């Protein structure tokens, strides 16, 4: 993706460290989906006003997520899930936000550093710049951000919400979602589509036979219990209002 170039290190450079971040990506039921290794910049070492200026990036509100799931039921819409591959690397780095990064472990060369051409994971302003990129791509495809929630995009036939690189789409006809996905790819977005929305941000979505959508976090609860070393037989449990 032509993300950086190797340059000579000079005394006036503010060079920040880099790390490898290893992560398991899981399905909503907790099963392992893929192993990920990501090269990241140590953003906490960036200098405000020198390496970056603004960092705020909106994310979809959970009230909006719940509202859209309710509309899916009431309007009998189809839903599909999308994920943007290497999201931050879509964004070209502006010259006034130039940052230099140490080469990753295993590839270091004496006197050499990386000069990123694209936004790197870990950079303080990467989320903001990607949100602007995604928003512009949506607008170019006739998807307008809502005034109530800028991460809710409303189009002639499709509705979408975005939480950084995770996107949910809704439409009466699945073909309209597929057509929008094609247009977004034409805008340069590396968008992977999945089947019906099975989960979002760690919450599992289950569709019942009587037309309801259940939201569960069983895998997260099990992970917390395991991490804390709790005995489920000894721990006291409480019913949620929805289960009573």
Give residue spans per PLM region:
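Long, low-complexity, charge-biased intrinsically disordered regions
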Residues: 1-244
């Amino acid at each position: 993706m032509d993300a950086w170039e190797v340059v000579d290190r000079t005394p006036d450079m503010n060079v920040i460290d880099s790390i490898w971040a290893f992560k398991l990506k899981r399905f909503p039921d907790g099963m392992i989906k893929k192993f990920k290794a990501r090269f990241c910049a140590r953003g906490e070492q960036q200098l405000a006003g020198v390496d970056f200026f603004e960092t705020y990036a909106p994310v979809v509100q959970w009230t909006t997520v719940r509202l859209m799931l309710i509309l899916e039921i009431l309007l009998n819409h189809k839903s599909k899930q999308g994920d943007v591959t290497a999201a931050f690397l879509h964004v070209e780095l502006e010259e006034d936000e130039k940052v230099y990064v140490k080469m990753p472990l295993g590839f270091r060369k004496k006197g050499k550093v990386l000069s990123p051409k694209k936004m790197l994971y870990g950079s303080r302003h990467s989320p903001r710049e990607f949100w602007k990129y995604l928003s512009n791509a949506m607008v170019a495809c006739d998807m307008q951000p809502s005034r109530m929630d800028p991460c809710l995009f409303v189009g002639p036939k499709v509705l979408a919400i975005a939480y950084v690189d995770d996107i949910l789409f809704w439409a009466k006809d699945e073909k309209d979602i597929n057509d929008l996905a094609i247009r977004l790819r034409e805008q340069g977005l590396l968008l992977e589509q999945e089947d019906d929305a099975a989960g979002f941000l760690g919450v599992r979505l289950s569709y019942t036979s009587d037309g309801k959508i259940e939201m569960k976090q069983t895998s997260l609860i099990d992970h917390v219990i395991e991490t804390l070393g709790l005995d489920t037989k000894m721990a006291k449990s409480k019913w949620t209002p929805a289960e009573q």
